[in-house]
Amino acid sequence: MAATTSKIDDSMPARISSDCPEEIREVLYYAWGHDRSGLKKLLKTTGKATAQDPKTGETPLHAAIRACGPASPDDDGQEEDGSVEEAKDIVHDLFLQGAIWNDVDSNNETPGCLALRLGRKSLYQLCIEAGVRAELLFALMGDYEELSSGSEDGDEEMEVQQDDDEEAPQLVSTEDVEPTVEEPKFIPPDAKEKQVTSEEYLNSKLVYDDAKLVDSDLNGVMMAWETDIMRRSVAALIPDSAPGKRILNIGFGMGIVDGMFAELKPSRHHIIEAHPSVLEHLSKDESKFGPSWEKSGPEEGAFKVHKGKWQDIVPKLLEDGEIYDAIYFDTFGEDYSQLRYFFSECIIGIMDQEGKFSFFNGLGADRKICYDVYTKVVEMQCADAGLDVEWEESDVDMSGLEKAGEGEWEGVRRRYWTLDSKSFEGAAVLRYAVGTSNRL
């Protein structure tokens, strides 16, 4: 989450530390001064665009943006002052030389977070565009690595052999080697924050109460405050509330969205859930989606909880010829690559031509720049997968969600939604995608 504005000193002495290494200080000064010609000379050296003050984490991107200062309250963003125009050139050059769009400083702000806080909309937009380019490139590189790794039919690796009569290299005494002194490096504020993986999540013990579902590390898996968001998602998936729809939900959690789907009297309602604690909860007699619910379907197998990972279950549904009118995706502990794999590789085989797909969009929801970047990335990659995407926005009532450890977040380790109303210049907004097939 980006820092608040009240305690941040944006002056140059505060951001470029007195003991910052000379070669880093130099590039920061040039970026701060918007000296394009001088900076270009420095950027010829590899790594200069990504340099960071080891104490403050200031990067050349931060420096170029911070030097503009805050925008005037009556600035509508249509006419920007000369310093912003100069900064745009510097930011462009830095991104061209490999500057990282989401590096954070000691305030836990990315360059985009800083531009947003200062009200510099055009600079913020440049950061979004750079983030989108970077994420799309990483996705392409990941696809390439997946295709090329483990190939047994490709070129064999070249083996280097040493002739028996070749003289062996002499051993070098460790006393003759001068130890290298590592330059101090900036440590991000959240460097020690534990990241949740799917494997760790599935092996953890979950605890239910009326307001939330948390894992053994107190990560919020699902919370009651999401109810209104899910209600809007259901309305978008089935806008006429028509009965008889074929529904697939991936990730049961607290059963919020499944309860809403059930009220619409679907003809088929399938749930995929992998976590043992959730499955145990579902198996109880008092569960609304337990054995008695499965038996209440219009035909055998119409209402069913599929136990296991969706990566294993979906191929079986495809083999069985299952087709759905509405598909909702809300897993936990998985990164974006898994969501992308689902809508790129799986949707086409199990969704009706007139069907709709949606997911809980918490991608980067603890930082607006990340949220905006992933909104564009998802839209572009859904289009590549043959899905027409329409984003709908839902106001989020932030009462009780403002502070970590308080209100709705009491008993939860970290807030996974932190975008307040200031982030959107109005009510807090959650975007959710509704994808429909554009394939003939």
From Swiss-Prot:
For the keyword Nucleus, the answer is: yes
The segment annotated Disordered runs over 147-194
Q: Which interval of the chain is the signal sequence?
A: none
- Cited InterPro entries: Ankyrin_rpt-contain_sf, Arginine_N-MeTrfase_2, RMT2/GAMT_Mtase, RMT2_dom, SAM-dependent_MTases_sf
- Entry's localization field: Cytoplasm; Nucleus
Q: Which GO terms describe its biological process?
A: methylation
User: What are the TM regions of this chain, as residue ranges?
Assistant: none
Q: Which domain of life is it from?
A: Eukaryota
Extent of Acidic residues compositional bias: 152-168
Chain positions recorded as S-adenosyl-L-methionine binding sites:
201, 230, 252-257, 273-275, 310-311, 330
Mention any one GO cellular component term assigned to this protein in its UniProt record: nucleus
Q: What is its main location?
A: cytoplasm
For bias type Basic and acidic residues, the affected ranges are 182-194
Boundaries of every RMT2 domain copy: 192-440
Task: List the EC numbers from the record.
Answer: 2.1.1.-
The UniProt entry, under PROSITE patterns, shows:
SAM_RMT2 (PS51559)
Q: What does this protein do?
A: S-adenosyl-L-methionine-dependent protein-arginine N-methyltransferase that methylates the delta-nitrogen atom of arginine residues to form N5-methylarginine (type IV) in target proteins. Monomethylates ribosomal protein L12.
> What family, per the record?
Belongs to the class I-like SAM-binding methyltransferase superfamily. RMT2 methyltransferase family.
User: What is the official name of this protein in its record?
Assistant: Protein arginine N-methyltransferase 2
Organism of provenance: Gibberella zeae (strain ATCC MYA-4620 / CBS 123657 / FGSC 9075 / NRRL 31084 / PH-1)
Q: What is the lineage of its organism?
A: Eukaryota, Fungi, Dikarya, Ascomycota, Pezizomycotina
